[in-house]
Every structure is written in C-alpha cells, then in structure tokens.
Amino acid sequence: RLIEAGTRCVTLAFSRWDHHGDNFNALRQDAPLLDQGLTALIQDLHERGLEKDISVVVWGEFGRTPQINKGAGRDHWPQVSCALLAGGGMRHGQVIGATDRLGGEAKERPVKFGEVFATLYKALGIDPDFTTLADLSGRPQYLVDEHLPPMKELL
C-alpha cells in the first residue's frame, strides 16, 4: 500500500539477527517470521502486478562464522555472506556463487558488494558509472566504488 501510494523506498526491520549466543533458539523464532513475511510480500507484488517495478532486498552487512562459538552463536564473518534479491525485473530462481563445504570461503563466483549495488541501480534505471552525489565537501562521489558492473546473471 505504501508503494501504491507513491512511497519510493520502504525499509523494514525486525529482530536483531546478531546472534552471538543462543543462535538456534533465536532462529527457530525469527526465521519462520521472515519466511512468511517475504512470501506474503512477493505474492502480493505478483497479485498487484508490481513484481517488475519493485526490488526486494534482504541483506546484511556481513556473514556469520561457519563454526558455532562457546555461547552457541555465530560471530561476524566478512569472508562470506548471502543476499536475497527478488522482483525489480531481475532474473529469479537461481543461486549465484558457492562456498566451500563449511560455508567459510567463497569458491565459485564470488560477488562484491559493489556488483549488487550496481545491479540494483541498473534495475532502477540509474547508471552507476556516471551518476554521482555530492559529499559533505561538495565533491562528487560515484554510487559504486571501483566502477563494478551489474551482475549479468540477474539482468
């Protein structure tokens, strides 16, 4: 309803997802809620014909350790992360990249943050190679560091 009313960006957050301890009990509570909410959102977008116009992004700033710590949790792990992207006219129903068997290191098609950003900007009709925003000093800053290309697998 917010999007249909003209809102350009909607951000939702629930729970902490920072389970350094009691990981399994926390996920038993939170994961079904995320699953049900995302399913309802994506179904609703399809029913309203908005699935090509709206990008859904579920993403954290880092992954979690492949090993459980002493407090039955997982700590920060920047080597590997995951994201869920849907809608926005992107190709769906695929997994891009792979890790080793423990989920500790990227082994196939590592994806950089900038590639995901470039993909989202491209889906929004924004060219990240030429679009800049002024920083607090008035200097132009590109939207994506390193001028990384959008992910060809998604577009």
Language-model regions, residue ranges each:
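Ligand-binding pockets and gating/stacking loops
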Residues: 1-155
